[in-house]
């Protein structure tokens, strides 16, 4: 059964570890992440971008697939199904479709409009027993056409959004989506500490978890980050493993062209990436 992300993140915040949010793109992705979470006894958040939602034919399809897998794979660890970087309309659709959590990305609105829209969605989510994440300060890189430059959030704006009753907050601290450029200056721990001071016990979220050095991840967790988003790293691992399979001519051997065989190495590569991240984040064994 799907659960809201709030309880697992409150526990993570208190226990000084983070829960991984791994974006799903299809059946292989979803299965790989769920099986790894179960094997490692780790709570997990399945993230769905609006683009991936369209690709998988809609949010109802995704809810059906995930709920079916939870039952068929006997998944007993806490699993949240979470809309990633949702528009106002996207959040409403996911609330209807049966997601257990949403993120409203109002970071490109003026703060007054962000506050108004966030307030409405907090009310709708909490009425349905769902959790809601909000964002202040655009995360750099490109996420389904929304381009941000890796701003640092204003701690006072973070407090204004936190006070609306959101369950966890993504604050821009110089992090970006996708691959980090060689001249990236690193995370702004000064901003993170200032945000933490303003929002108190509220779990914080780190987007763009791919390519951030392990020591910076651990420091961010010590400063209140309880949810870390990973997507690009799984995509690269999947693509590299699939390319290797084809370059070695394995798709031409026997029935190597069968999609179940063709996609298996990529699926295993996702599992290995998820395992590595769960170990780094400290969530292994936390669902026991």
What are the functions of these language-model segments?
Residues 3-11, 15, 27-52, 57-76, ...:
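Alpha/beta enzyme core
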Residues 17-25, 50-54, 261, 265:
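A short N-terminal beta->alpha junction/helix N-cap motif
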Residues 20, 145-148, 182, 207, ...:
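A general structural-boundary detector
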Residues 173, 208-210, 232:
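Active-site proximal loops enriched in glycine and acidic residues that flank catalytic Cys/His/Asp
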């Amino acid at each position: 059964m799907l659960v809201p992300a709030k309880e697992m993140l409150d526990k993570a915040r208190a226990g000084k570890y983070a829960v991984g949010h791994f974006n799903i793109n299809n059946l292989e992705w979803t299965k790989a992440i769920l099986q790894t979470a179960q094997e490692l006894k780790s709570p997990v958040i399945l993230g769905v971008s609006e683009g991936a939602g369209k690709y998988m034919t809609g949010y109802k399809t995704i809810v059906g697939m995930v709920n079916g897998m939870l039952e068929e794979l006997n998944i007993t660890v806490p699993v949240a199904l979470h809309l990633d970087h949702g528009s106002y309309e996207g959040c409403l659709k996911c609330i209807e479709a049966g997601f257990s959590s949403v993120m409203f990305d109002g970071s490109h609105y003026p703060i007054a409009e962000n506050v108004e829209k966030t307030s409405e969605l907090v009310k709708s989510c909490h009425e349905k027993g769902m959790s809601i994440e909000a964002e202040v300060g655009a995360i750099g890189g490109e996420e389904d056409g929304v381009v941000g430059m890796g701003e640092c959030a204003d701690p006072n704006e973070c407090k204004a959004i936190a006070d609306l009753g959101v369950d966890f907050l993504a604050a821009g601290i110089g992090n970006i989506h996708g691959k980090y450029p060689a001249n990236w200056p690193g995370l702004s721990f000064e901003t993170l500490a200032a945000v933490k001071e303003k929002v108190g016990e509220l779990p914080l979220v780190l987007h763009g978890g791919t390519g951030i050095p392990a020591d910076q991840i651990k420091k961010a967790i010590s400063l209140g980050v309880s949810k870390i988003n990973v997507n690009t790293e799984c995509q690269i691992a999947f693509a590299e493993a699939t390319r290797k399979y084809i370059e070695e001519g394995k798709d031409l051997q026997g029935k190597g062209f069968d999609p179940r065989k063709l996609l298996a190495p990529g699926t295993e590569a996702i599992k290995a990436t998820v395992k590595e991240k769960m170990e780094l984040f400290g969530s292994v064994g936390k669902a026991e």
